[in-house]
Amino acid sequence: RVPGGFLPDEDQGFLLACLILKPNTSLQVAYEQDKKFEAALQDPAVKNLTTVVGLNILNSVQTPGACIAYIELKDWSERPETSAELAGKLQGKLAQAGRDGMAMVLEPPAIPGVGTANGVTMVLEDLEGQGVAYLHEQVQRFQEAASRRPEIALCMDMMMADMPQKYVNLDKEKCKFHKVDIDVANGILASYNGSSFINYFNAFGQQWQVYIQAQGEDRASLEKMDGFFVTNADGARVPLSALVNIREIEDTEFVMHHNIYNAAKLNVMPRPGHSTQQVMDALKEVFHQTMDPTKVGFDYQDMSFQENKVRNSIGLRAI
């Protein structure tokens, strides 16, 4: 039986490479890692190389600990390898270079604009809303089982649930003790550490927006909240630091939604000699072996969504 698929990958003359660094990596560190990343991607078959720091293209989010590279290849007549062969070659060079994170080289999707890379894009959904920690646990279990399948070369989850963060809780009892309106305190906390829209104004033939927020140096650390004050019922100024509780936590950097549920995306690459259809069948088997379908659901995105839709709507006919 010949393995089936949706559309075959083609040599489009360019590749994508993505570098995901460890949680809480600063932009400055990412710039240093990007130099090593760019050096490892140099090859006689590469015509131009452009890197962007601070963008995770697989999840379409801006994050300081990620880099993306657009690799333009030389004309087919000037290089002996196909784009698929070059992707494997560059992936090996990245592995040898040593890096503080995860890197991958990807071919673009067969249909431009439908997703960001080839392979299979699967989504696991938290149907009961049990929270990010529960979803991450299910994703890890699914990923471990899927990685053992012979059809699958690589199964990556983009849900980083161990991002070090600071949880700031506005204490109601402290607000009551200091005679501070909790809504006012919450507004100041959000406006100074985030931003708040004020209004529009017209000038120089254009319409402008007005926002307020604290200066960058005053938002660099939570200790700076000693300089933010709230006026209480007696007219006295109370520092925000006296109204909040702060603790260290680990949580996800972002949460994606799919079909109204919290979800996690998996990027899955077929092993050579296997089609995306075989990979999708393998993933479905793994799902039913490891997941409770009443608590966790699954779906596809990008090219995989189209492939699954075609498989479910068009039957095989023989004349």
Predicted regions: what is each one?
Residues 14-21, 66-72, 104, 119-126, ...:
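Active-site-flanking beta-strand signature of metal-NTP-handling nucleotidyl enzymes
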Residues 22, 54-55, 72-74, 127, ...:
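Residue-level recognition of strand-loop junctions within catalytic nucleotide-signaling folds
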Residues 28-116, 128, 132-144, 173-195, ...:
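Solvent-exposed, membrane-proximal periplasmic/extracellular interface segments of envelope transport
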Residues 1-24, 78, 105, 118:
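Transmembrane helices with small-residue packing motifs
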Residues 2-9, 55-61, 106-115, 153-158, ...:
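Short beta-strand/turn micro-motifs at beta-sheet edges
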Residues 11-35, 43, 124:
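Membrane-interface junction motifs in transport/secretion proteins
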Residues 10-14, 62-68, 115-117, 163, ...:
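Short, solvent-exposed loop/turn segments at the edges of secondary structure
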Residues 102, 140-319:
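Extracytoplasmic/periplasmic membrane-proximal domains and adjacent transmembrane bundles
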